[in-house]
């Protein structure tokens, strides 16, 4: 009897176990591409991948999309005009259109006339619309990956906590576009943090300062009482000296010497205010007094130069508890600066903007912290949801960019050598907030303080970001975007800005989509195939912007490829010579450089070439493999002269179908 009872109990235990197992089975969602982080880079990656036909999950920890541009309120674009291309150009064009319809200028920041700024909520609205129109993109907010499954050296899936519930996301390719590089760390891929490499992380290493911006505006009809800072916030006196040395009531005008005036401060990060009918131009100082909306993001870097620490510890990235504490301290510093504005600077009718839509999710539980008394909550609740993070974990990729890759000629405004595998452009000068002494840089990469140029005089200049920095050295199924690409700390000082992160995000999205389309791992792709998609999206990849080859011309992509792979030379820095008529000697030399061919059909080398003659010549040249190239050859007809632009386009078409491409550096 006792044995029978045991068997019955065991049976019911098994039934309960099976039932419990199914009850706890995770919901699974399947996608082609999963983008972790909906910042500037993540949104661009999702848009590009969706436009290429992918199903995309865009997973974001906060309740905002747009990252540093919106959720961190760095909505004054740090561009130098030459990176206005691709999805970034689409985005700022929509920003201009939105404000133009409201008779409001966007060129009101950075003391310049050719600038772009917007309100964070407007930036988010535009990104959401771009994502909606891109294709199949599911935006999952307030969602955080907790674990990553890797089998056979490939990222397969990730468990994501969504509204307190764990959901399994499976994808063919994952992209880490988080603000901190958190997904890379979960994946097990090696990464750099400060000047050390995982898993041997030096806890004494440092990263750049963070900043907790705040959108503020002038309340001309009177400041709501709850938006007045009620007494000096904790730590105020610790920051007062720095505040006074940066901005003072009777400070200098721009350009000038520190400290600067409140008017100069407001013009630095000024953003549009459609309720203000004044005509404002960032390049005209006489209009700056009319600015009624700006962002606190100048004297409030955290930790700044205060205290004994030389910079922010890498624990900010590695330790959730330290991250939360540092974030709250950064909030306090910004609150202190707002108090300084309302008191010493005499800006008593200025405070946080109550119409940006902030106040939902926050990256830190500041409201439960004893250092934030109840009287500050009405103001802090209108702060952005998370800080501006300048330096994240950085993937160890197939290759790592160093300062040598971004040394630019001041006169030409670009690097002197081209990278054949370029997938994005950068332009910003090297800007490191904090210490850049050699002991804080990567010795294994040969980075030293002495090698860092002072490139602010030339306003930076163009450089290229190649395919290999997006792909892990070993792990498959994963790509990096945002500030997480494979670069040194010094290079991150130039690649962390919004225009660059949008362009590198677009590149990562193209790599991921092409990987799925071709059914190979990202590292197995031919960069030219990815470049072709980016050119289709009007994303410029070369160092040149020729006046005779605009991006809407038939020869533009061919000219881009010719400059990347070095098989043709331009007439000048500004003109390619698209309409120049080609001689056989020039055709021969181009094919030698582009395809490595040495033997050619006989022709009179000094004779001009017609398109039909070129077609016949190609049939003889590729006779042994004619099927491969026939489609390109059939598109060449007519007795018109073969132009340089037509030759460039034809060579690109041939390279696309060629069995392999030979890098010409």
Identify the role of each PLM range.
Residues 9-18:
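Bacterial N-terminal signal peptides
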């Amino acid at each position: 009897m006792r044995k029978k009872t045991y068997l019955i109990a065991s049976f019911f235990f098994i039934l309960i176990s099976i039932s419990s197992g199914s009850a706890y089975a995770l919901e699974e969602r399947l996608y082609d591409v999963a983008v972790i982080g909906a910042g500037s880079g993540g949104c661009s990656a999702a848009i590009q991948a969706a436009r290429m036909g992918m199903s995309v999950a865009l997973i974001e920890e906060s309740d905002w999309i747009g990252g540093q541009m919106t959720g961190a309120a760095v909505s004054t674009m740090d561009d130098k005009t030459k990176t206005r291309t691709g999805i970034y150009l689409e985005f700022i064009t929509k920003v201009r259109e939105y404000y133009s319809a409201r008779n409001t200028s966007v060129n009101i920041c950075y003391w310049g006339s050719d600038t772009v700024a917007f309100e964070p909520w407007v930036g988010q609205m535009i990104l959401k619309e771009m994502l909606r129109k891109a294709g199949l993109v599911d935006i999952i907010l307030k969602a955080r990956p907790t674990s990553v499954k890797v089998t056979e050296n490939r990222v397969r899936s990730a468990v994501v906590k969504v509204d307190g519930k764990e959901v399994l996301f499976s994808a063919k390719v994952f992209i880490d576009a988080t603000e901190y590089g958190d997904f890379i760390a979960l994946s097990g891929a090696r990464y750099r943090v400060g000047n050390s490499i995982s898993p041997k992380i030096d806890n004494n290493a440092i990263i750049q300062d963070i900043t907790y911006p705040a959108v503020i505006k002038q309340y001309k009809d009177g400041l709501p009482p709850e938006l007045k800072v009620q007494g000096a916030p904790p730590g105020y006196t610790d920051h007062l000296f720095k505040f006074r040395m940066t901005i003072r009531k009777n400070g200098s005008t721009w350009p000038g010497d520190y400290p600067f005036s409140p008017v100069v401060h407001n013009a630095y990060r000024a953003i549009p205010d459609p309720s203000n009918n004044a005509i404002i131009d960032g390049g005209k100082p006489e209009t700056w007094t009319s600015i009624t909306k700006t962002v606190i993001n100048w004297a409030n870097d955290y930790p700044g130069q205060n205290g004994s620490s030389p910079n922010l510890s890498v624990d900010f990235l590695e330790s959730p508890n330290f991250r939360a504490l540092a974030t709250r301290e950064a909030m306090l510093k910004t609150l202190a600066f707002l108090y300084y504005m309302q008191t010493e600077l005499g800006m008593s009718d200025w405070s946080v903007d109550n119409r940006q839509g902030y106040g939902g999710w926050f990256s830190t539980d500041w409201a439960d912290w004893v250092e934030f008394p109840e009287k500050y909550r009405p103001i802090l609740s209108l702060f952005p949801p998370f800080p501006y993070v300048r330096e994240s974990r950085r993937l160890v990729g197939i290759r790592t960019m160093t300062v040598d890759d971004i040394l630019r000629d001041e006169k030409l405004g670009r690097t002197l050598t081209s990278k054949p595998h370029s997938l994005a452009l950068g332009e910003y000068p090297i800007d490191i907030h904090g210490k850049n002494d050699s002991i804080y840089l990567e010795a294994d990469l040969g980075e030293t303080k002495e090698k860092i140029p002072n490139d602010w005089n030339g306003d930076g200049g163009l450089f290229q970001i190649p395919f290999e920095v997006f792909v892990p050295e070993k792990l498959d199924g994963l790509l990096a975007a945002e500030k997480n690409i494979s670069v040194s700390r010094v290079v991150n000082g130039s690649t962390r800005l919004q225009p660059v992160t949008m362009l590198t995000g677009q590149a990562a999205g193209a790599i991921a989509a092409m990987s799925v389309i071709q059914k190979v791992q990202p590292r197995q792709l031919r960069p030219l195939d990815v470049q072709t998609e980016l050119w289709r999206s009007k994303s410029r990849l070369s160092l040149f912007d020729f006046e005779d080859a605009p991006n809407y011309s038939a020869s533009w992509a061919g000219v881009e490829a010719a400059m990347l792979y070095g098989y043709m030379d331009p007439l000048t820095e500004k003109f390619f010579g698209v309409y120049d008529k080609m001689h056989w000697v020039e055709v021969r030399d181009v094919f030698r450089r582009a395809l490595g061919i040495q033997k050619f059909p006989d022709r009179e080398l000094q004779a001009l070439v017609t398109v039909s003659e070129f077609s016949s010549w190609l049939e003889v040249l590729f006779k042994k493999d004619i099927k491969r190239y026939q489609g390109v050859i059939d598109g060449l007809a007519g007795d018109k002269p073969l132009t340089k632009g037509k030759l460039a386009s034809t060579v690109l078409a041939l390279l696309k179908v060629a069995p392999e491409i030979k890098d010409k550096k």
